[in-house]
A protein has these predicted regions:
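Functionally critical loop-and-helix segments that line ligand-binding/catalytic clefts
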Residues: 1-19, 134-214
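Substrate-binding cleft of extracellular glycoside hydrolase catalytic domains
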Residues: 1-117, 135
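Short, aromatic/basic amphipathic alpha-helical patches
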Residues: 50, 102, 128-132, 156-161
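Short, amphipathic alpha-helical "lid/cap" segments that border enzyme active or binding sites
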Residues: 70-74, 195, 225-228
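Heptad-repeat coiled-coil amphipathic alpha-helices that mediate oligomerization/assembly
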Residues: 209-275
Length: 276
C-alpha cells in the first residue's frame, strides 16, 4: 500500500489545519524544528501537538548547516524537538557527509536516535556520490510538474523516482512541492508499506489498534463514531427510546423510524383498494 504525508515549515504559514489533513487521508507529517545553531521554527510546537491530536505520525526535522557548529545545532534541535521522531534535512549548504555523520552522532549522544534523513539524489551527486548505505531512513526528492491533490500528482509505485543510490534504497519519496492539501500548497511524500512499517521506520511501537479500523487515524475513527451515533439516534430516537412524534406501538412505546415505516406499510397494504 502507498501512504501519503506532508512536509511543512514556517514557509507554509502557521494555519494549516491538520485535522483536515487527516480527513483528506494523509497519515504523517514532517515539520521543521530548527536550522543551524540559532533558528527555531515558531510553527513547530503547534504543528507537532496538532499532529498528535489528529492521529498523524510526526517527525521533526533539523536543517543541517555546514557553516554552523554541529554541537550547537544538536543542542538547539534537541531543546525544541519534544515528543516526535527525528529527521535530518541534509541538502543545499549542509556540507559533506562527514558533517552529516557528526550531527547524527551528536544527536545520538544526547539520547535520541536519528530516524530519517532527507538527502535528495541531486545533493548526493553534488557532494561526490558517497556511500550512503548506512544512512537512516533515506528520503529522496524528485518532483512532478503541476499542482493538484497529492494522489493525482503521485508518479506511481514503479516510478524511477524510487530508484535507490549510494548503496541505499529509497524509504520515502518526496514527489512534489505543490500538492493541494487542506487548502494549501505543500510538499507531499509517499511511503510504500503498511502503517506499522512506517511506524517502525520512525522508531515507534506498532499500533495497538487492530482490525479494519487500524487503517483510520484517530480523527477519522472519532468522525466515524460520531456518524454512527447520529445514524443510530435518527433510527432509534433519543436514547434509543423511539420518537414521540411518530406515535406509539401496541405496548405504548414510542415508535422508532423503522417501526413507523413498517406501520405505514401495513396501513397502506390494509387500506381499501380504489375501484374503477
Amino acid at each position: 500500500m502507498t501512504i501519503f504525508g506532508i512536509d511543512i515549515s514556517n514557509n507554509n504559514g502557521p494555519d494549516i489545519d491538520l485535522a483536515q489533513v487527516a480527513r483528506e487521508g494523509f497519515r504523517f507529517v514532517f515539520a521543521k524544528v530548527s536550522e543551524g545553531d540559532r533558528f527555531a521554527d515558531h510553527t513547530w510546537p503547534a504543528y507537532r501537538d496538532a499532529a498528535h491530536a489528529n492521529g498523524l505520525l510526526v517527525a521533526g526535522y533539523h536543517y543541517l548547516r555546514g557553516d554552523a557548529d554541529v554541537e550547537g545545532q544538536a543542542d538547539l534541535y534537541i531543546a525544541h524537538l519534544g515528543d516526535a521522531a527525528t529527521m535530518v534535512d541534509f541538502e543545499a549548504d549542509s556540507g559533506d557527509l562527514s558533517t552529516f555523520w557528526a550531527f547524527v552522532n551528536a544527536v545520538n549522544a544526547r539520547g535520541r536516535q536519528i530516524n530519517l534523513s532527507y538527502l535528495p539524489r541531486w545533493y548526493w551527486q553534488r557532494i561526490g556520490c558517497p556511500d550512503v548505505s548506512t544512512v537512516p531512513g533515506l528520503i529522496q526528492s524528485s518532483y512532478v510538474y503541476g499542482s493538484a491533490p497529492a494522489a493525482a500528482l503521485y508518479p506511481g509505485d514503479d516510478s524511477p523516482f524510487w530508484t535507490g543510490f549510494g548503496g541505499k534504497n529509497v524509504d520515502i519519496l518526496q514527489f512534489t512541492d505543490a500538492a493541494v492539501v487542506a487548502g494549501h500548497r505543500v510538499d507531499a511524500n509517499a511511503f510504500l508499506g503498511t502503517l506499522d512499517q512506517l511506524r517502525a521506520l520512525l522508531g515507534l511501537a506498532p499500533s495497538t489498534t487492530q482490525g479494519v479500523l487500524m487503517a483510520l487515524t484517530d480523527a477519522q475513527q472519532a468522525d466515524l463514531y460520531e456518524k454512527v451515533q447520529e445514524i443510530w439516534g435518527q433510527l432509534r430516537g433519543p436514547d434509543g427510546q423511539g420518537w414521540p412524534q411518530l406515535g406509539r406501538n401496541a405496548q405504548g412505546q414510542n415508535m422508532t423510524l423503522v417501526d413507523a415505516v413498517a406501520k405505514l406499510q401495513q396501513d397502506l397494504l390494509s387500506a381499501p383498494k380504489a375501484t374503477s
